[in-house]
Amino acid sequence: MEYNFQEIEKRVQGQWRKDKVYRVAEDTSKKPFYVLDMFPYPSGAGLHVGHPLGYIASDIFSRYKRLRGFNVLHPMGYDAFGLPAEQYAIQTGQHPEKTTEENTARYREQLDKIGFSYDWEREIRTCDPNYYKWTQWAFLKMFDSYYCNQAQQARPISELIEVFARQGNDGLNVACGEGVRFTAEEWTAMSEKEQQEILMNYRLAYLGDTMVNWCPALGTVLANDEVKDGVSERGGHPVEQKKMRQWCLRVSAYAERLLHDLETLDWTESLKETQRNWIGRSEGAEMEFRLAGKDCTFTIFTTRADTIFGVTFMVLAPESELVEEVTTEEQRAAVETYLTETKRRTERERISDKRVSGVFSGSYAINPLTGKEIPIWISDYVLAGYGTGAIMAVPAHDTRDFAFARHFDLPIVQVVVPEGEPATDPATWEDAKDSKSGIMVNSDFLNGLSVEDAIAQTKEYIREKHLGCVKVNYRLRDAIFSRQRYWGEPFPIYYKEGMPHALDEDRLPLRLPEVDKFLPTESGEPPLGRATGWHTAEGYPYELSTMPGFAGSSAYYLRYMDPQNDTALVSRSANEYWRHVDLYIGGTEHATGHLIYSRFWNKFLFDLGIVCEAEPFRKLVNQGMIQGRSNFVYRIKNTNTFVSYGLREQYEVTPLHVDVNIVSNDQLDIDRFRAWRPEYTSAEFILEDGKYICGWAIEKMSKSMFNVVNPDDIIARYGADTLRLYEMFLGPLEQSKPWDTNGIDGVHRFLKKFWALYYNTDGIRVTDTAPTKEELKSLHKLIKKVGQDIESFSFNTSIPAFMICVNELTAAKTTSRAILCPLLTVLSPFAPHITEWLWQELGVEGSIVTATWPEYNEEYLVESCVRYPVSFNGKVRFNIELPADMSKEDVEQAALIAPEAARWLEGKSPKKVIVVPGRIVNVVV
């Protein structure tokens, strides 16, 4: 019987569905293990071969853990809200719900074909009201909470209201925005609206004025990673910086916990470092600077207060409220022009771009330690959200300050020199000098001190003179949580007298209403402004913005634990059983977005007692990207003639991308090429050796480069098991690598050879004969190797091990059930269809999914013989096979009396013989 993968995979998948073999429930008799993929956004294009890489790896690990006796939770769902579906709806008039439903059906079909072991009864979609009910519920909990810095915990806002009524807000150690001081009497005398405005400074979900990336063409706020080079990633529309009233989450309150708890996680050090940098903890001081000629001060944060004597100018962020205060009439036009220019640049671009720009405000500040006036400039290399949005510039010891000073011809004063060296003239420098260590100069009472001592003494001086305070600062910002779009979660908020109020929980979910168009209204309101009756029963209007894309993905891993629960996000019992995600697989692009927000969300729920662990993802593995392998044809200019790759240098040619699906091993199928596009119907070709050979390059998979490979096509030609094995065979999971079908035939031939171990022309060839020592050695070597590979995520090295084992068993003409049954189990995580089929054919009870992983026996792995390379004067001349337990003396003697030795000894006695037991013999003549 031949290996008919199409019949096998169709029947096996049908049997799995019928028997519900992947259904999972809490089982206290088994140890739980939760494996999760970062769920996909269901785009209209469907999956290409790069998408399943991480899914296949997690599926192998899930199947392996089941075989090891674990109760494995391995679910899948869809991150279904988002901008792409809405843009498509605007272009076509189709409702996003309809296109999303079609796309998820397509994804499900593709995922099923690959044979994943998902428990589909736990499927979730973020656009399902029964799911986003719990996103809305979590938002309400944040709205009704504040963060107590002293307890390092979220607490009910009602407790804070009681404190205000008792003592006002003096001396409170809580996370808050800009606020005014008030007494208990003043609080009590406030109107409800005034009190609500005060509370907005403390809520974990709050309305605030913030700078955003505003895209007028799309009519919405965009995240930093949705903007590139000043335009939207989707559509290429201009984006500007704009201050807007937005819903925000006070993520910054959790900065220290987010940083500290990284040390408890089994993540790569590079990913942890990315998050550390994003959180950006820095210790320093806040200092007060007075405006010259005005009764006004402003605060700056610095990590190097000791360099205060090197300050030669101040810089404000363009968004700073102080800009209006410090700009003189003489400079107003120049400042306004500059502010308009900077609106077109995102924060991320401002951080990464090294070009120098700025404008003088016309005003001066007073250095609090020297009393000298220093000019105040405005520049976009200072960010409003970090520190106070104002900096003291020390150009001698900061690269960006140095570049700014050089560009605008501002003074540069050196205040730190390497120990034992004199100060030098900054006019001769090419860049700022390092100031992390050294001795202070030009710094008054700090002169002669080490940097470390100067930092400590300056902080003490600032405290004593009441010039500021010591402070820890974080780069991490609060998350902007509203989008002016339709296709997202509605906020469970209504407005009364202009102030937001929480919807009662028993009225959740607040469902998305129908609208006639998915565009902003004529008056500029978000699309929900088009909805009829978008208000409470009492007539109070609902919020018109919707939640951002990361809202639905911030706690989805919890819902998988208990997806049918109507009364809670997750029951206590389900959460205490599964606890956390043991293995999370996804791309590095989520390091500073989703992975920060999910950790924050989980910690908040932990504070409320909803979840039992503070961290959601115990181990995280980032899969690399499968890149496209593009092919090119070479058209002779001004003709429709194409020249083969090896002859292209002889002509003036233009390289053109060609569909990789009409190329095999870089050889173009000319007939299919002519049929591919009308303009190529009459194409002529100049061949080499009767073939048209294409050029190639490694590029991102993209429809525009015609290098997208559909997994359906691979499965139709080779089968899902071949696809699974080949994706793992391409290289280490964490590394990016090119997709290249040139090697897939070898993997498919391996499966045919594997099949032939079990079947011949007469049918099943497996017998109950006892295995030989060599067969046991081959099997147990494989069991050990593959188990270790899976545990270390080295899936690529398992594939050659399978091939070697099958070659050895084929050569041995193995038919023993004692060998071939365990072999099926070991291969089953990688190739589940062929192994399930053969398992059933061998009459083994139950599915191979519920089998037990075989344990290897070290006794079978002991080498009885060792193959020694024998060298003469350092060059290997022959090999000799000897018993593994032979003594060094006997190995030496055996090597010297071997028939091949006489030729190299030439009748001489060896000067020296070196024997490395089990490795090599070297004879010095």
UniProtKB/Swiss-Prot annotation:
Keyword Protein biosynthesis appears in the UniProt entry: yes
Domain of life: Bacteria
Ranges in a coiled coil: none
Keywords from the UniProt entry: Aminoacyl-tRNA synthetase, ATP-binding, Cytoplasm, Ligase, Nucleotide-binding, Protein biosynthesis
Annotated compartments: Cytoplasm
This enzyme's EC code(s): 6.1.1.4
Catalyzed reactions per annotation: tRNA(Leu) + L-leucine + ATP = L-leucyl-tRNA(Leu) + AMP + diphosphate
Motif mapping: 'KMSKS' region: 700-704
Gene Ontology BP term (one): leucyl-tRNA aminoacylation
High-level lineage: Bacteria, Pseudomonadati, Bacteroidota, Bacteroidia, Bacteroidales
One annotated GO molecular function: leucine-tRNA ligase activity
Gene Ontology cellular-component annotations: cytosol
Keyword Nuclease tagged: no
Motif 'HIGH' region per UniProt: ranges: 40-51
Leader sequence residues: none
Location (main, coarse): cytoplasm
UniProt organism field: Porphyromonas gingivalis (strain ATCC BAA-308 / W83)
Binding site for ATP: K703
Protein family according to the UniProt entry: Belongs to the class-I aminoacyl-tRNA synthetase family.
Protein name, UniProt field: Leucine--tRNA ligase
